[in-house]
């Protein structure tokens, strides 16, 4: 999501901050006429447009911090003249104009020296990324060998037979070695589709909760909170506790400068990322021990499940939380919301890993004060498998891989598939990935065992301290992601043909609900209607097969 120039403040949102011409008009049309617009997109040549990292519909750059500098080491030795494995070949990779593309730029010279091949890098506006690649493969042109893709495009690409698996290259000693089993279970599941490996590990997205550690530890706040709510102020374990903490801090001076702060901040701009926040929040209201899979559709018949009692209650919770944030956040993209937290103006938020890394950079007002934890749970969930509410002895907490999880895929029409895999595998090596995760500003988030500190993993604290992390902040941050990605209960990841249309339908009706135009129940009922229309337009049987394959079902 960040801008491509490393001289600009880092944010994975920056590349889609601007939309021009026909695309801006298309978005305006979508916002004005959500139901018909969603239907109109289905059945066109591409149902999922380009998106930068976690934010498919555009966002703004973070402005209050500056990136640090940390360069990954060279891994592949230069080949000797006459023995270079891919002499004369050219690998063309399609990338977004974003900081998330910087790692590819960094290894260009190393790749060419190690292989004898040439690396051609094509960068386009993030909104054009998917369309450019899709047009190429749909017409069998083969202009691009690889694409840095969002994980939720994979269903579209596999269904069209537009990308190839790399299973036959993975074990070969001819290529840089990386270990897929070092990727934690949840993000690892996104690398394969239908039992075959397609995406080479790179970025590992998921949402966690951020809180002001200094505020929760303040004795005066602890005393006042207990007097008001009857229990100890602490890290929220449930969304009900999250609400209490947000309500308590709302309207207080959180920075000592006399300015009024807010209990929370969430990016809820219409047509942007609100559906991602809802998905993560809603997971423990729907997913649970007796219902580990049913969230989006019934895999037997592709009937939408989005208007279940659990989904409705979760949206009611989100709508209620809005009152504890700045009203302007209804028009904010992630960058704006992150800025607000980085400036010390909010006590709580939940979002992607970018924020934890950005909090350590120059300009942040909260470095050394940022607590991080897995998202809160709920005391009960509506088990769609049993059609009833279920309650356990402890809060039901669910992990997530919400976001883009950017990774390379190989085009079916690549003329140099082996050289292409060499490039992607080189970027996936432990030596490279360790630096990407530690520096943070490149938008490549942790998700592999060597990213995490003992006892969770094998990382060294010095790697993070050299990248300017506060030690307490980074220990919280990494452990929160380890728990999130290791949780056996996960929000099912939607990655089938038409994903963009489904998410856009949810997004637009969600905006109506948080804006007070319709009730949560009405918003999700309308979403379910759109989901059914989209499925019918694409084809129920084809969607059922794709959905089951995406879940690993036979």
Residue ranges of predicted features:
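Short helix-initiation/N-cap motifs at beta->coil->alpha
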Residues: 124-132, 237-241, 329-343
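Hinge/lid segment of periplasmic solute-binding proteins
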Residues: 45-85, 151-210, 277, 373, ...
